[in-house]
Amino acid sequence: VAFAIALSVAPLQARSQPDRLAQLRERYDKETDPVHKAKRLVPLGNAEFDQIEKQIADGDQNGALNGLRQYQTQADSVEKALDARNQNPERHPGGYKELQFSVREALRRLDNLVVSLTSDQQQPFLDVRKDLDNLNRRLIKELFPSQPTNSK
């Protein structure tokens, strides 16, 4: 019985994933407050990476790369909007903290994806990864500016 239920629910979940992604994107796009936008990026980023992973599994590297670039654009725009508020991220971490969580998770998931690609396929993904890593480092530095820096 449980197996039959699982089989009947699986198509619904597969169908609802694009709907969920569209709903999350719509809520993200409508949000005007940078802190709330950063908070909305967390579930949106997870849903986008679910889609990216599926595209990689289906052999659609171009679609996956476009999705990854879209995530990068969203993360960059949230950072710019947060910075435009001219508030100290160390004292007012709202938004920065959520953005850093999302970017860190994106980097982790991207690292897991890249190993499944050929070296030729990896390069454009690694280019985006480098930009996301730079964003992550900036966010950490803004959130924790008084921490000693590693002089490597």
Please give the residue ranges for each predicted region:
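Bacterial N-terminal signal peptides
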Residues: 1-10
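Long, charged/polar, soluble alpha-helical segments
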Residues: 14-152
